């Protein structure tokens, strides 16, 4: 959820999830809206470098939805200053998101995918790093046309989940977080 982080309700926490996430059974698992390891663009890039090193050189990057354009430009400036570039950036549109997000946030926080993707692509071209950073696109991609459009706007690949959610029966009841999904897509009991 934009600006809110994520919440996995206690009812959905299995012993396996509790062990992996380090949370007690019977308690909501709250993921903060920001990462505790960094708070600046330079810190973000240093975290990307640490992840790449810890994984033995596997690709490392980050996902974002463009809010204020100057914030991404600060990341671009940090890339130039540090020489650290992510292997990839996934641009999410405000149209994406979760059924647990408040409607006001889903409709009014962040840039639409087309605008955000075009901005990120053009910014990376402008600073001369587009050839070093791959761009993924996500957010309400449901058709072949949606895929072709984001590829034409500069994406190297796209993530498409919504169409698959519909295929397995999602009716967008926006109750994913309640543990009472009417079609069972977000509830496996």
Describe the residue ranges of each PLM region:
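Flexible glycine-/small-residue-enriched beta->alpha junction loops
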Residues: 1-26
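Short glycine/proline- and acidic residue-enriched helix-loop micro-motifs
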Residues: 26-34
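Glycine-rich phosphate/ribose-binding loops and adjacent secondary-structure elements
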Residues: 35-189
């Amino acid at each position: 959820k934009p600006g809110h982080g994520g919440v996995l309700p206690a009812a959905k926490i299995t012993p396996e999830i509790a062990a992996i996430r380090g949370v007690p059974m019977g308690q909501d698992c709250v993921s903060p809206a920001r990462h505790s390891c960094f708070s600046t663009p330079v810190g973000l890039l240093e975290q990307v470098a640490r992840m790449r090193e810890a994984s033995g050189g596997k690709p490392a990057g980050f996902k974002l939805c463009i809010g204020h354009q100057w914030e991404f430009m600060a990341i671009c400036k940090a890339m130039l200053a540090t020489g650290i570039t992510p292997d990839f950036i996934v641009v999410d549109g405000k149209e994406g998101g979760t059924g647990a997000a408040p409607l006001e946030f889903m409709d009014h926080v962040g840039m639409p995918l087309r605008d955000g993707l075009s901005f990120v692509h053009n910014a990376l071209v402008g600073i001369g790093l587009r050839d070093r950073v791959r761009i993924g696109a996500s957010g309400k991609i449901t058709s072949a046309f949606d895929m072709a459009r984001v590829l034409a706007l500069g994406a190297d690949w796209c993530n498409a989940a919504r169409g698959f959610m519909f295929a397995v029966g999602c009716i967008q009841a926006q109750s994913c977080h309640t543990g009472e999904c009417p079609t069972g897509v977000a509830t496996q009991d």
